[in-house]
């Protein structure tokens, strides 16, 4: 393929990506507009879903310094205790058996010592980190790439429910939002932003 055709294809892809991103942005804004409706808020509360804005007292203080912090956070259960340490544990979905064991053991030990573990409830390292955190007894928190009422991956529904017993499920995406691919890299900034330290248990060299 000559350079002219390459440039045409690159421009076409760029324009298409812009259209997709604009559509996603407008859909997100439409959802957030609903937050001005008190009846909508009451409906969420009946579903056990709470909303906190960047202007609210309960908004996580750790996120405030960041320019790209989410304007709103939706959550079920509760938010991390700001007076206790928070450690994020993340890593590969397709991880080794050794990685799973280490994630679970380390999370359990940290949790036994009063450290709140936060992760993304994804397959692999995230899942085993949160299982270990539950075994340690200190509340753990999951930041999802979907709405807080959408358990993803679906096979983690038991883990999802166990986290809610003492901890919380958090998302910047409105209830009902599906697990769209572009949500996940963005939610990572919330995981790291809420944490005092981040532990990458196992990951490929160019992992997200």
Residue ranges and their predicted role:
Residues 1-57:
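Short, small/acidic-rich helices and loops at N termini and domain boundaries
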């Amino acid at each position: 393929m000559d350079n002219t055709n390459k440039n045409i294809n690159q421009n076409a892809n760029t324009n298409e990506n812009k259209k997709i991103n604009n559509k996603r942005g407008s859909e997100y804004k439409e959802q957030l507009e609903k937050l001005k409706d008190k009846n909508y808020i009451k409906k969420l509360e009946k579903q056990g879903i709470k909303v906190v804005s960047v202007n609210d007292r309960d908004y996580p203080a750790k996120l405030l310094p960041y320019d790209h912090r989410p304007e709103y956070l939706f959550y079920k259960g509760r938010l991390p205790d700001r007076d206790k340490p928070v450690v994020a544990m993340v890593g590969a979905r397709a991880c080794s058996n050794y990685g799973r064991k280490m994630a679970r053991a380390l999370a359990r030990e940290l949790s036994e010592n009063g450290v709140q573990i936060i992760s993304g409830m994804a397959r692999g390292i995230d899942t085993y980190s949160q299982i270990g955190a539950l075994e340690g007894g200190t509340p753990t928190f999951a930041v999802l790439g979907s709405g807080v009422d959408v358990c993803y991956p679906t096979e983690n529904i038991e883990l999802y429910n166990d986290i809610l017993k003492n901890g919380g499920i958090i998302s910047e995406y409105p209830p009902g939002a599906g697990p769209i691919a572009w949500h996940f890299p963005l939610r990572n900034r919330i995981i790291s932003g809420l944490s005092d330290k981040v532990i990458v248990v196992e990951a490929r060299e160019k992992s997200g």
